[in-house]
Amino acid sequence: MIKAENLTKRFYDTVAVDHIYAEIHNGSVFGLIGTNGAGKSTFLRMAAGILKPDEGSVTVDDETVFENTKVKARCFYIPDEPYFLSNGTAEDMKVFYQGIYPKFDAARFDKLLKNFELESRRKVQTFSKGMKKQLAVLLGICAGTDYLFCDETFDGLDPVMRQTVKSLFANDIEERNLTPVIASHNLRELEDICDHVGLLHKGGMLLSKDLDDMKLNIHKIQCVLPAGVGSSDLQGIDIIKTEQRGSLLTLTVRGKREEIQTILQAYHPVFFEMIPLSLEEIFISETEVAGYDIKKLIF
């Protein structure tokens, strides 16, 4: 497990990461959401042992990461702009990482290169941005590490390739308990892969929640209530947001689905249905309650 406690990093007068507490459990997919400058990259670099915290700590299975060779060998970091050897080829990068990561799976890497139609002997500097991202992901997956830190990894990939990469992650999560930590400015990119999402803003963690819990506890309801009954009359329901269009009432509510249904049915609605919420809608609801406008934070 990765644990950050009071984690802080400053660059001169700028606080890049501001006293963050977070836990990332093994085998889960943790998403970090935030705009550029929110602190995502700095957090990942400290978690991977590249940067030293100014305050607090980040540990992997209770061991400090920075300057700990044994722990760092279990971590692979894919930066927003991946590093490749000057004039190097994909084959050169394979040999390079074989010397760093003992569990690097060269046979799997060669197979994936062919599947992704990436030339092993072609200089990486001639690759497109998307091809470089693909190569970085393949190197990270084949390194055989327990933790994979991905900084805007899906940026530059077309929709088909994004799904292919997500499938690779899912395979390694199931087979060897890989723990990806994925930073992105795009919430939609993470909706179908993450188990847990943290929202970073100005170096602070505004929100950190399990997605299943969020989806189970926030619901959208559309209903038509009997004449004379309005949303203010609904007792026992934690209403986050109300929208009225003619007789159709749309509610965003918090609580257990069955209990909400029971309470609403007691008012004998003319029409009633519960609609699944997207991750974006859930985050908007959660952050509005906390007094933030998420559209200004990540969109």
What are these regions (language model features)?
Residues 165-255:
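ABC transporter nucleotide-binding domain
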Residues 2-4, 9-195, 199-201:
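ABC transporter nucleotide-binding domains
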Residues 16, 67, 189, 230, ...:
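Short phosphate-engaging motifs
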Residues 69, 215-218, 264, 287:
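Short, flexible helix/strand-to-coil boundary loops that buttress conserved ligand/catalytic motifs
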Residues 252-299:
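C-terminal coupling/interaction segments
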Residues 89, 210, 275-278:
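Short loop/turn segments at beta->alpha junctions
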